[in-house]
Amino acid sequence: MCIRDSSNLVQNTDVAFLRPDMCTIGGITAGMKVAHFAEAHNVNIIPHNPLGPVSTAACLQICASIPNLGIQELPGFCLNGAEDKMVKEPLRFENGCMLIPEAPGIGIELADDAEELYPANERGSNAARRAFDGAVKDW
């Protein structure tokens, strides 16, 4: 989903919420654009978050700054401590809620050995292939 897709969906259908993936939609700026547009149409945002602590921290910053947050999706490994060794200070929970990181930037700092432990790999484009009518195909 991109900003334009989100706009078309909100304007042309009766949706209650959108689930943008902040890492594939274009980051925090694009995510905020979608959230603000959705807010103007009484649509909630539920950020899709299947990735690691950087994605989670970015989503939490967006969640803290929009009035139309529905709920924040968390990947399972976020709950079992697997992400903790990726960052210097693990994301924290209190009373069943994830706390918004308050450090500079998005609130986290990668562990010194994160690049060595989790080397980057090239990924293909996440852009969906479209049929002549705009429908997603081969997804």
What does each model-identified segment do?
Residues R4-P104:
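Shared catalytic-loop signature of beta/alpha-barrel
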